[in-house]
């Protein structure tokens, strides 16, 4: 991890090799330093994983991230927790709960994912969210605590943002690339 954090930003091949060492594979993974984790060996990422600046993954339990998942700057994924009762907590007890992401997940900046959370496939989590509970497939969710705001539908295919459609030329190119 230290090696990754001190590499030249332009050394994409070197960063890819370090990511492969850290996660056991890279397969199109890109991690923009600085990046922090407890071990790295409990983190499994799918194809085309992207973590922007200052990603923190406390991996005392397994973290499984699907294909095509993107994390904006300052995303934190926590698997570690501590007992509620003060005397037990002060004895330095810790537990870990797995965190999982499906495929095609986009996590907005400054978001915290708490221990034990499962985020489904094709999900967007809005910036600044604190995710304390599972999020179903095809959801747009945000807030503190994070809640489902709406579901992603076919109507969203041509949308860049809520009220802005992709122009016809770009749409034709997208359809061609996707084989639609």
Q: What label would you give each PLM region?
A:
Residues 35-45, 50-118, 144-145, 150-153, ...:
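Flexible, glycine/small-residue-enriched loop-and-beta-strand segment within the central core
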Residues 106, 124, 140-142:
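Short-chain dehydrogenase/reductase
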Residues 1-28, 146-180:
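Terminal amphipathic alpha-helical/low-complexity segments used for targeting or macromolecular assembly
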Residues 135-137, 142-145:
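Acidic, glycine-centered active-site loop in nucleotide-sugar glycosyltransferases
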Residues 108-134:
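Beta-rich strand-turn-strand
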């Amino acid at each position: 991890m230290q090696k990754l954090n001190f590499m030249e930003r332009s050394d994409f091949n070197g960063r890819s090799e370090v990511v492969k060492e850290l996660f056991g594979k890279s397969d199109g993974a890109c991690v923009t330093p600085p990046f922090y984790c407890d071990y790295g060996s409990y983190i499994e990422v799918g194809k085309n994983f992207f973590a922007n600046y200052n990603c923190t993954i406390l991996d005392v339990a397994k973290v499984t991230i699907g294909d095509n998942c993107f994390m904006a700057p300052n995303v934190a994924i926590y698997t570690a927790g501590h007992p509620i009762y003060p005397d037990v907590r002060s004895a330095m007890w810790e537990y870990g709960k797995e965190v999982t992401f499906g495929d095609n997940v986009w996590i907005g900046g400054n978001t915290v994912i708490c221990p034990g959370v499962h985020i489904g496939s094709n999900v967007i989590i809005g910036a600044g969210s604190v995710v304390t509970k599972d999020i179903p497939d095809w959801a747009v969710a945000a807030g503190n605590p994070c809640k489902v705001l709406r579901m992603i539908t076919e109507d969203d295919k041509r949308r860049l943002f809520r009220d802005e459609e992709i122009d016809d030329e770009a749409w034709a190119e997208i359809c061609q690339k996707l084989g639609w």
